[in-house]
Amino acid sequence: MFGVAKPPPSPIPKPPRGRHFGEKYPESVNFPSRGARQRASTRHRPSIKEVWEPPAPPGAGMIFWGENGENGDFGQSAPSCYERRRARSQGGQGAENAAPVLRPGPEGRRRRESLIFLEGDMVRETATVAPWTVSPLRPERPKSLLGRFRSRLTVWREVPRTPGPVAPIPELPGEADDPPTRTPPPPPDD
Protein backbone atom coordinates (compact mmCIF):
# COMPACT_ATOMS: atom_id res chain seq x y z
CA MET A 1 0.00 0.00 0.00
CA PHE A 2 2.81 2.33 0.91
CA GLY A 3 5.07 1.22 -1.86
CA VAL A 4 8.19 3.06 -2.82
CA ALA A 5 8.36 4.51 -6.29
CA LYS A 6 10.52 2.31 -8.50
CA PRO A 7 13.41 3.94 -10.29
CA PRO A 8 13.06 4.18 -14.04
CA PRO A 9 14.26 1.03 -15.78
CA SER A 10 17.84 1.33 -16.85
CA PRO A 11 18.53 0.85 -20.55
CA ILE A 12 19.81 -2.53 -21.62
CA PRO A 13 23.59 -2.45 -21.35
CA LYS A 14 25.15 -2.55 -24.76
CA PRO A 15 28.36 -4.41 -25.49
CA PRO A 16 31.44 -2.23 -25.82
CA ARG A 17 31.79 -0.86 -29.31
CA GLY A 18 35.18 -2.32 -29.95
CA ARG A 19 37.33 -2.12 -32.99
CA HIS A 20 36.07 -5.37 -34.50
CA PHE A 21 32.40 -4.89 -33.71
CA GLY A 22 30.91 -1.43 -33.52
CA GLU A 23 33.22 0.39 -35.88
CA LYS A 24 33.03 -2.13 -38.68
CA TYR A 25 29.44 -3.33 -38.51
CA PRO A 26 27.54 -0.95 -36.21
CA GLU A 27 24.07 -2.16 -37.20
CA SER A 28 24.57 -5.93 -37.11
CA VAL A 29 27.64 -7.72 -35.89
CA ASN A 30 26.84 -11.26 -36.94
CA PHE A 31 25.13 -10.45 -40.23
CA PRO A 32 27.12 -7.89 -42.19
CA SER A 33 25.51 -6.14 -45.08
CA ARG A 34 25.75 -7.40 -48.62
CA GLY A 35 28.25 -4.72 -49.54
CA ALA A 36 30.48 -5.70 -46.63
CA ARG A 37 30.32 -9.33 -47.68
CA GLN A 38 31.26 -8.42 -51.24
CA ARG A 39 34.17 -6.31 -50.05
CA ALA A 40 35.36 -9.12 -47.83
CA SER A 41 35.16 -11.64 -50.67
CA THR A 42 37.23 -9.74 -53.22
CA ARG A 43 40.16 -12.08 -52.66
CA HIS A 44 39.43 -15.34 -54.43
CA ARG A 45 39.22 -18.29 -52.08
CA PRO A 46 39.39 -21.58 -53.98
CA SER A 47 36.76 -24.09 -53.07
CA ILE A 48 37.41 -27.73 -52.27
CA LYS A 49 36.31 -28.73 -55.76
CA GLU A 50 38.76 -26.33 -57.38
CA VAL A 51 41.64 -27.63 -55.32
CA TRP A 52 40.90 -31.33 -55.34
CA GLU A 53 39.65 -31.75 -58.91
CA PRO A 54 42.25 -30.01 -61.09
CA PRO A 55 43.24 -31.30 -64.50
CA ALA A 56 45.41 -34.20 -63.44
CA PRO A 57 48.86 -34.63 -64.97
CA PRO A 58 49.60 -37.84 -66.87
CA GLY A 59 50.20 -40.73 -64.58
CA ALA A 60 48.28 -39.21 -61.69
CA GLY A 61 46.63 -41.56 -59.28
CA MET A 62 43.40 -41.42 -57.36
CA ILE A 63 42.33 -40.22 -53.97
CA PHE A 64 40.72 -42.54 -51.45
CA TRP A 65 38.57 -41.11 -48.70
CA GLY A 66 37.08 -43.33 -46.04
CA GLU A 67 37.85 -46.79 -44.84
CA ASN A 68 37.61 -48.54 -48.21
CA GLY A 69 37.77 -45.61 -50.57
CA GLU A 70 34.33 -44.03 -50.39
CA ASN A 71 34.40 -40.53 -51.82
CA GLY A 72 32.91 -37.57 -50.04
CA ASP A 73 34.10 -38.32 -46.51
CA PHE A 74 35.27 -34.90 -45.39
CA GLY A 75 35.67 -35.85 -41.75
CA GLN A 76 38.95 -36.60 -40.02
CA SER A 77 40.50 -37.82 -43.24
CA ALA A 78 40.05 -34.47 -44.99
CA PRO A 79 43.13 -32.26 -45.21
CA SER A 80 43.00 -28.98 -43.40
CA CYS A 81 42.51 -25.64 -45.07
CA TYR A 82 46.22 -24.95 -44.59
CA GLU A 83 47.13 -28.10 -46.49
CA ARG A 84 44.74 -27.22 -49.30
CA ARG A 85 46.31 -23.78 -49.64
CA ARG A 86 49.77 -25.30 -49.58
CA ALA A 87 48.76 -27.77 -52.28
CA ARG A 88 47.41 -24.91 -54.34
CA SER A 89 50.54 -22.80 -53.91
CA GLN A 90 52.93 -25.64 -54.70
CA GLY A 91 50.83 -26.79 -57.60
CA GLY A 92 51.74 -23.96 -59.93
CA GLN A 93 55.52 -24.01 -59.91
CA GLY A 94 56.06 -26.01 -63.08
CA ALA A 95 54.55 -28.24 -65.70
CA GLU A 96 54.79 -31.38 -63.64
CA ASN A 97 53.60 -29.53 -60.56
CA ALA A 98 50.38 -28.47 -62.26
CA ALA A 99 48.35 -30.39 -59.69
CA PRO A 100 48.98 -32.42 -56.58
CA VAL A 101 49.29 -36.08 -57.46
CA LEU A 102 46.90 -38.07 -55.33
CA ARG A 103 47.51 -41.75 -54.77
CA PRO A 104 45.44 -44.29 -52.89
CA GLY A 105 46.86 -45.71 -49.72
CA PRO A 106 46.55 -49.35 -48.73
CA GLU A 107 42.99 -50.50 -48.31
CA GLY A 108 41.49 -51.71 -45.07
CA ARG A 109 42.79 -50.84 -41.64
CA ARG A 110 46.19 -49.86 -43.00
CA ARG A 111 44.57 -47.02 -44.94
CA ARG A 112 46.61 -43.84 -45.34
CA GLU A 113 45.76 -40.61 -47.10
CA SER A 114 48.72 -38.98 -48.76
CA LEU A 115 49.47 -35.72 -50.48
CA ILE A 116 52.32 -36.11 -52.92
CA PHE A 117 54.17 -33.21 -54.52
CA LEU A 118 56.59 -33.80 -57.37
CA GLU A 119 59.87 -31.96 -56.90
CA GLY A 120 62.28 -33.00 -59.62
CA ASP A 121 63.24 -36.62 -59.11
CA MET A 122 62.15 -36.57 -55.50
CA VAL A 123 58.71 -36.74 -53.98
CA ARG A 124 57.64 -35.24 -50.71
CA GLU A 125 54.80 -37.29 -49.31
CA THR A 126 52.90 -35.82 -46.41
CA ALA A 127 50.89 -38.67 -45.00
CA THR A 128 48.22 -38.75 -42.34
CA VAL A 129 48.90 -42.05 -40.64
CA ALA A 130 46.33 -43.75 -38.47
CA PRO A 131 47.62 -44.81 -35.04
CA TRP A 132 47.39 -48.49 -35.94
CA THR A 133 49.65 -48.05 -38.97
CA VAL A 134 53.34 -48.73 -38.66
CA SER A 135 55.70 -45.93 -39.58
CA PRO A 136 56.80 -45.97 -43.25
CA LEU A 137 60.15 -44.56 -42.14
CA ARG A 138 60.90 -47.44 -39.77
CA PRO A 139 58.72 -50.48 -40.47
CA GLU A 140 60.12 -52.25 -37.42
CA ARG A 141 58.85 -49.49 -35.14
CA PRO A 142 56.18 -50.78 -32.74
CA LYS A 143 52.69 -49.55 -33.42
CA SER A 144 52.21 -48.40 -29.85
CA LEU A 145 54.93 -45.77 -30.19
CA LEU A 146 52.87 -43.84 -32.72
CA GLY A 147 50.59 -42.78 -29.90
CA ARG A 148 46.89 -42.65 -29.55
CA PHE A 149 46.28 -39.83 -31.98
CA ARG A 150 46.91 -39.50 -35.68
CA SER A 151 50.49 -38.66 -36.54
CA ARG A 152 51.98 -36.49 -39.25
CA LEU A 153 54.86 -37.97 -41.19
CA THR A 154 56.82 -36.53 -44.08
CA VAL A 155 58.47 -39.15 -46.25
CA TRP A 156 61.09 -38.42 -48.90
CA ARG A 157 61.72 -41.05 -51.50
CA GLU A 158 62.88 -41.33 -55.10
CA VAL A 159 60.34 -42.10 -57.77
CA PRO A 160 60.67 -42.56 -61.53
CA ARG A 161 59.42 -39.71 -63.63
CA THR A 162 56.19 -39.87 -65.56
CA PRO A 163 56.55 -42.45 -68.36
CA GLY A 164 56.88 -40.92 -71.79
CA PRO A 165 58.62 -41.36 -75.12
CA VAL A 166 62.13 -42.63 -74.61
CA ALA A 167 64.83 -40.52 -76.21
CA PRO A 168 67.15 -42.44 -78.56
CA ILE A 169 70.50 -43.36 -77.11
CA PRO A 170 73.31 -41.46 -78.87
CA GLU A 171 75.86 -43.51 -80.72
CA LEU A 172 79.14 -44.00 -78.94
CA PRO A 173 82.49 -43.29 -80.66
CA GLY A 174 83.75 -46.29 -82.57
CA GLU A 175 80.34 -47.42 -83.80
CA ALA A 176 79.66 -48.41 -87.39
CA ASP A 177 78.17 -45.04 -88.31
CA ASP A 178 81.30 -43.15 -87.31
CA PRO A 179 83.76 -42.21 -90.10
CA PRO A 180 86.84 -44.44 -90.17
CA THR A 181 89.83 -43.01 -88.38
CA ARG A 182 92.33 -44.32 -90.98
CA THR A 183 92.14 -45.33 -94.62
CA PRO A 184 91.77 -49.07 -95.17
CA PRO A 185 94.65 -50.83 -96.95
CA PRO A 186 94.26 -51.25 -100.72
CA PRO A 187 93.02 -54.65 -101.92
CA PRO A 188 95.87 -57.05 -102.85
CA ASP A 189 96.71 -57.37 -106.57
CA ASP A 190 96.43 -60.84 -108.07
From Swiss-Prot:
Residues 1-15, 162-171, 181-190 have a biased composition (Pro residues). Residues 1-110, 160-190 are annotated as: Disordered. Residues 36-46 have a biased composition (Basic residues). It comes from the Viruses. This is Protein E6C. It comes from Equine herpesvirus 2 (strain 86/87) (EHV-2).
